[in-house]
């Protein structure tokens, strides 16, 4: 039976400081490391054998993947990394304190940017974009595909093709797959997997460092789901 494990990265340093993160590359906090280690132990304790893992290009997800595989004694499995699993790009909000953003733009506007399905935040500056284009981790990507900012809908539109072309192919081979990613890239996958409405998915909360297991039928219909 195909099995999918979705795990949002552990708490990051910027999560702890209440900052918009997006594509900004930050490490796990001490609490985040403990969450990721705990996730690995839960997978080990439930005797789940992972065949392959997918993660983003951002350090907090990469670290979470490493801690999960170490904690479950499966460091040797193949791990594939893709920018398509990156967090939603928060554009000009990245690096800003969320409370300060509310004071500047108002509670309603910030809530709309954060929780609407198809509303984008302000674009990042050309200087910010130039820094991303020069970053070695993104050198292999067509720069025309690099976002200035994203809505949840935009995030879904880059995540689902990666699911179809890569992740789902291993599940169709009856494998157990780990996806260690981010709140919004995982939210996009959940919307697609469960067929949730736009209204339902924007309010869907995803815990940090908590493995969410999907048991799937042979044609990848959700049979059961549960947190470890």
UniProtKB/Swiss-Prot annotation:
- SUPFAM superfamilies in UniProt: Phosphoglycerate mutase-like
Per the record, a Pfam family? His_Phos_1
Family annotation (SMART domains): PGAM (SM00855)
* Reactions mediated catalytically: (2R)-2-phosphoglycerate = (2R)-3-phosphoglycerate
Q: Which GO terms describe its biological process?
A: gluconeogenesis; glycolytic process
Kindly state which keywords UniProt assigns to this record, in alphabetical order: Gluconeogenesis, Glycolysis, Isomerase
* Protein residues bound to substrate: 8-15, 21-22, 60, 87-90, 98, 114-115, 183-184
Signal peptide segment: none
Q: Give the active-site positions.
A: 9 (tele-phosphohistidine intermediate), 87 (proton donor/acceptor)
Site note Transition state stabilizer, residues? 182
What PANTHER family would the database entry show? PHOSPHOGLYCERATE MUTASE
Family from the record: Belongs to the phosphoglycerate mutase family. BPG-dependent PGAM subfamily.
Give a short account of what the protein does.
Catalyzes the interconversion of 2-phosphoglycerate and 3-phosphoglycerate.
Q: Which NCBIfam families match?
A: pgm_1 (TIGR01258), PRK14115.1 (NF010713), PRK14119.1 (NF010717)
Its protein name is 2,3-bisphosphoglycerate-dependent phosphoglycerate mutase
Its source organism is Staphylococcus epidermidis (strain ATCC 35984 / DSM 28319 / BCRC 17069 / CCUG 31568 / BM 3577 / RP62A)
């Amino acid at each position: 039976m195909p099995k999918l494990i979705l795990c949002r990265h552990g708490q990051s340093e910027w999560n702890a400081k209440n900052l918009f993160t997006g594509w900004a590359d930050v490490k796990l906090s001490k609490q985040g490391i403990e969450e990721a280690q705990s996730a690995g132990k839960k997978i080990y304790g439930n005797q789940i054998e992972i065949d392959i893992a997918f993660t983003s290009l951002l350090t907090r997800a990469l670290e979470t993947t490493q801690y999960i595989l170490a904690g479950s004694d499966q460091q040797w499995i193949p791990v594939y990394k893709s920018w398509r699993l990156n967090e939603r790009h928060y554009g000009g909000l990245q690096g800003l304190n969320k409370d300060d953003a509310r004071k500047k733009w108002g509670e309603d506007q910030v809530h709309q940017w954060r929780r609407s399905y198809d509303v984008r935040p302000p674009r990042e500056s050309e200087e910010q974009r130039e820094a991303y284009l020069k970053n070695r981790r993104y050198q292999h990507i067509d720069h025309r595909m690099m976002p200035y900012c994203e809505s949840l809908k935009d995030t879904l539109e880059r995540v689902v093709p990666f699911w179809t072309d890569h992740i789902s192919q291993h599940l169709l081979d009856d494998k157990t797959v780990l996806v260690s990613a981010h709140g919004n890239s995982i939210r996009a996958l959940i919307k697609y997997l469960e067929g949730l409405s736009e209204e339902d998915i924007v309010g869907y909360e995803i815990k940090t460092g908590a493995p969410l297991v999907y048991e799937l039928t042979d044609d990848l219909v959700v049979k059961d789901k549960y947190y470890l």
